[in-house]
Amino acid sequence: MCPPVRIYGKNRHTEEMSEMLEQQREYVLRTVEERGVRLVRLWFTDILGNLKSFAISPAELENALEDGMTFDGSSIEGFSRVQEADVLAIPDPNTFEVLPWADPKGTEARVFCNIHNLDGTPFDADPRQVLKRNLDAAVKLGYAFYIAPDIEYFYFAPPQKGELPQPLDEGGFFDLTTSDIATSLRKETIRTLETMGIPVEYSFHEDAPSQHEIDLRHTDALTMADSIMTFRLAVREVAAMHNVHATFMPKPLEGVQGSGMHLHLSLFKGEDNAFYDEKDAYNLSPTAKSFMAGLLRHAAEITAVTNQTVNSYKRLVPGFEAPVHISWARNNRSGLIRVPVPKKGNAMATRIEYRSPDPATNPYLAFSVILAAGLRGIEQGYTLPVEADANLFEMSDADLNKLSIEQLPQSLADALDIMERSELVASALGEHIFEWFLRNKRAEWRGYKTQVTPFELNRYLRSL
């Protein structure tokens, strides 16, 4: 891991930062003119992590960068009520990029926005503002939060109503094949991402048919959340240009593993990796151990956020390399937290891997609750449980109970029940998002419960 480059709290370099912000605004305006940009898309997300956008002309951009652009917040589910509809989108010029996919009507660019109330205060329903607030809490303790995700997804033929998903290949882990459409799509996606300033570390074919993984290089949490939103759109855009459907649904196929988004986490203090201790047997500092302990203690509470769909829990089952048990170990992929063994002497690479999240999550909210859980462990001095280095999938319930190893929630309903009682999650998300999220996801669960599935028809229709 590299030392942090972006800090979000107040500091003595305010004037210097203002000057840098002004320079970035000038760069954006100059680039728009030089590249012949015809439209600038202002991006933000709703509470569930769906990417939203409206476009402005270059003539409006300078005003937007200075004062923001108003829009009707009541048109975004979970944002505003009709009687208090208007909100303000203020572009973050650090996120400006020209979109690399071709548009016959002219070049387009995008910039992420922070959403504010009209009086200039942060808007409670903006997930990006929620993450910034939680990052500020880390800064007050002297930490910068870094993340590197391993993002899995599937390519399918264009879906037809009533038909099962049709994979494009039957490959497995690390398969090297002759030229095929899925591999070509992955390569083109990587080129697209790097054109947009999103560096890629690894990419390969995953275990399931037509399943692929792209791992992004670590960066600060806010930049990474923006990058994940861009990543999901880029994967879909590239696939759609070739009449292929890309999906981040956690478990689209039964009988094979689902798609996860393992998160490699670290804290930096100044230029030092706060998770590293060369004198420790695991090279883990007390800070790292308390952070891990916080994640383990609050894991069940944050699972509804990191795994927010009904379908998410069909991935979190034994036998498919997804975590089920709340435990940690070095290089053991059956637990919730894995501690990768870095190359010898590489203090910067010391990190932990949190393995339960899936790529359907809202990264701004997921990073917020993960950070809040870890910081709670640090602030209150939580003790890290004993390492569970056995294959947990092969252990009996009795043996797991002896080790006091609990399970993650087994359904969205279970996860919501636990989340609803969590003071930590309520504080991390804020009252508005916390309550709206629970209402929305309760409605999703009720809708799911009324469905009669093919499994039930095949099992019961003839026999009962």
Regions found by a protein language model. Give the residues of each.
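Glycine-rich, acidic/polar active-site loops that bind/position phosphate-bearing ligands
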Residues: S18-L464
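Short, Lys/Arg-enriched N-terminal segments with co-localized hydrophobic residues
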Residues: C2-E19
